[in-house]
Amino acid sequence: MADKGMTYSFDVRDNTLVVRRSTATKSGIKISYREDRGTSLLQKAFAGTEDEFWVELDQDVYVDKKIREFLVEEKMKDMSTRVSGAVAAAIERSVEFDNFSKEAAANIEMAGVDDEEAGGSGLVDNRRKNKGVSNMAYNLSLFIGMVFPALTTFFSAILSEGEMSIWQNGQAIMRILALADEDGKRQTRTGGQRVDMADVTKLNVVTANGKVKQVEVNLNDLKAAFRQSRPKRSDYRKGQGSKATESSISNQCMALIMKSVLSADQLFAPGVKMMRTNGFNASYTTLAEGANIPSKYLRHMRNCGGVALDLMGMKRIKNSPEGAKSKIFSIIQKKVRGRCRTEEQRLLTSALKISDGENKFQRIMDTLCTSFLIDPPRTTKCFIPPISSLMMYIQEGNSVLAMDFMKNGEDACKICREAKLKVGVNSTFTMSVARTCVAVSMVATAFCSADIIENAVPGSERYRSNIKANTTKPKKDSTYTIQGLRLSNVRYEARPETSQSNTDRSWQVNVTDSFGGLAVFNQGAIREMLGDGTSETTSVNVRALVKRILKSASERSARAVKTFMVGEQGKSAIVISGVGLFSIDFEGVEEAERITDMTPEIEFDEDDEEEEDIDI
């Protein structure tokens, strides 16, 4: 602990944090700065004590208990006015360190620091156990940890706490962010032509009481808040010799998030997402009215990731058993060479030979990957909680930077469980809240729309009107696929027990893969689906179809909703995520009565369950 009668002040000069003591004998204690393996490291030792304070700007923070107490008690009240930038954020995170378990602390990797430099504490040995975390997974964790608090602050002026915690609204926030972060003019297509978009756009959100409302978002203000909160280039972890820019790494992080947003599984499964760092869709659709623009994030990842996938294929072919692999290797090699932008890349590509040894082949490939601004060809398995759960978790004062949820599925589930929406419930709460969440996730988002279903369902008034669909007229007891919608397959299956009349027929809906394309949110149709009776344009058949969608999709949350309805009003904590309500924690209810089977499940590839980084 600090000596009594001795005061400390903090100052920042470039990447150096200076700590000054007011006594004549101890003053100007300076933190050394060095470059090590591409990582900016600040090393601090309080002279005259055994306490050490380690800060690594592009990673997380570890401080021992005494220094933490000193920071809290002596300086945290006015530190914000004296310390700025990444150093301030690092010290603030150190104060929050007690919020996390010892296991989480051990998972924070201190790259580039040996045990002798760390004072022989053994901390580095524990952290090196987590070497399997890839650069991309780490960078995304850092990106989320710095950007999401700013997003939470920005949207808290537009959305209530309850509205921000609803899963579908979290997805909408990320789409509207992608729309805002454009360098040039924002444009959309109307009638086959590009038109400029206004700086203020409308966003459709679900309210906590089960209604749908529109809010206005200033895209320029959102863009400014987003770019100000992004990590700097020096904060990211990069491969040796990497020329990746701040924008390129940030765009990769946004592409990963958009991949999670567009995941087909999110139509049905709440909780943790398993994804890979390559293979992204080429476009996304925002929830803004009529907005459908190509994503520069996904375009960036397509340009880089496409080469990465080809290089992975070349390595996989090289390591495969003997056969006709030389010809295939040569074809892919020519494809990669055609995408090269510099002479160096062309020479490196030509130097890849199927007969080379493993070490030589890998060195050439790593250099080539770096020149394309991508990590060496590895595939990393990551776990991402729902966007809304992350925002809710941060909104409650937590930090994600000390949690390696990108690799640790348990921490990802922890975020889901702890991101709770506490609702002051009264007798007006009904099943409509859960049904609204389900309806918006399956019908009223960019994945699908009321218009598409209405056009595609046989028997509805607008069936096959103004739609490019390769279908035949429905026949009894058959399954049909709607195509040509720039969508994945949507199947409508006629059940055998139904009548011969198409208008009375009962349909079962199966949705596969991701939706995208020209889906537009239709408020009137959604209100009709929810039974408001405010629109007369939607046919009875569509309402019946949506009821079946709601019934099928809400099976997971049915037990939770039922238990909630019979529980004590106003004394419950409720979680809205995924398809709706996936977990409920009752206050004052015996532990044995709590619902435990609604926790999001973690999915592993059977072959990869024990692997951290997988060389393809």
Curated annotation (Swiss-Prot):
Motif Nuclear localization signal mapped to chain: 230-233, 473-476
Disulphides: none
Compartments in which it is found: Virion; Host nucleus; Host nucleus, Host nucleolus
Keywords: Capsid protein, Helical capsid protein, Host nucleus, Viral nucleoprotein, Viral penetration into host nucleus, Virion, Virus entry into host cell
Assembly and oligomerization: Homomultimerizes to form the nucleocapsid. Binds to viral genomic RNA. Protein-RNA contacts are mediated by a combination of electrostatic interactions between positively charged residues and the phosphate backbone and planar interactions between aromatic side chains and bases.
UniProt function note: Encapsidates the negative strand viral RNA, protecting it from nucleases. The encapsidated genomic RNA is termed the ribonucleoprotein (RNP) and serves as template for transcription and replication.
Protein name per the record: Nucleoprotein
